[in-house]
Curated annotation (Swiss-Prot):
One of its GO terms (molecular function) is actin monomer binding. The modification Phosphothreonine is found at T52. Ca(2+) binds at D37, N39, D41, D48. N-terminus is methylated by METTL11A/NTM1. Phosphorylated by MYLK3 and MYLK2; promotes cardiac muscle contraction and function. Dephosphorylated by PPP1CB complexed to PPP1R12B. The phosphorylated form in adult is expressed as gradients across the heart from endocardium (low phosphorylation) to epicardium (high phosphorylation); regulates cardiac torsion and workload distribution. It holds the Pfam family EF-hand_7. One of its GO terms (cellular component) is myosin complex. Residues 24-59, 94-129, 130-165 form the EF-hand domain. This chain binds calcium. GO terms for biological process: cardiac muscle contraction; cardiac myofibril assembly; heart contraction; heart development; heart morphogenesis; muscle cell development; muscle cell fate specification; negative regulation of cell growth. Disruption phenotype: Myl2 homozygous die at 12.5 dpc, which is associated with ultrastructural defects in ventricular sarcomere assembly, that included disruptions and disorganization of the normal parallel alignment of the thick and thin filaments, narrower fiber widths and larger distances between Z disks and misalignment of Z-band between sarcomeres. Abundantly expressed in both cardiac and slow skeletal muscle. In the adult heart, the phosphorylated form is highly expressed in epicardium and weakly in endocardium. The modification N,N,N-trimethylalanine is found at A2. This is Myosin regulatory light chain 2, ventricular/cardiac muscle isoform. It comes from Mus musculus.
């Protein structure tokens, strides 16, 4: 019995990170972790991060950038550590900032807009996929501009505040 208890303490630390989130949120984090754990060894490492960025279309990520991400963890990144890191980042996080950061992953130049076709592709093929109807509803409510770009900064503002920016 003692080895099991010791293992749990190592994995989970002294606080129960699982109590910070609802069960549905934990399941979503588990899906994200599984997507990022490219080699399916139960840990996210540098190669997993590089492969994840490549899958998202960012192939020229600097080693330093990946090293900085890995250094944020107190040790090997298993699911419990992953969940703890997100819990710490999201504690008191502004929902607008959280959603913006999700879009910024796809906008490394920081333009504030993305090609609508690219957004449609990402939302229908990655993680928790949107249906065609859901995408059509989103673009009906927030149509792209004449060049086919979606102003995601304005979209996020409307989602979180219910009104357009001035």
């Amino acid at each position: 019995m003692a080895p099991k208890k010791a293992k749990k303490r190592i994995e989970g630390g002294s606080s129960n990170v699982f109590s910070m989130f609802e069960q549905t949120q934990i399941q979503e984090f588990k899906e994200a972790f599984t997507i990022m754990d490219q080699n399916r060894d139960g840990f996210i490492d540098k190669n997993d991060l590089r492969d994840t960025f490549a899958a998202l279309g960012r192939v020229n990520v600097k080693n330093e950038e990946i090293d900085e991400m890995i250094k944020e963890a107190p040790g090997p990144i298993n699911f419990t550590v992953f969940l703890t890191m997100f819990g710490e980042k999201l504690k008191g996080a502004d929902p607008e900032e959280t959603i913006l950061n999700a879009f910024k992953v796809f906008d490394p130049e920081g333009k504030g807009s993305l090609k609508a076709d690219y957004v449609r592709e990402m939302l229908t093929t990655q993680a928790e996929r949107f249906s065609k109807e859901e995408i059509d509803q989103m673009f009906a409510a927030f149509p792209p501009d004449v060049t086919g770009n979606l102003d995601y900064k304005n979209l996020v503002h409307i989602i979180t505040h219910g009104e357009e920016k001035d």
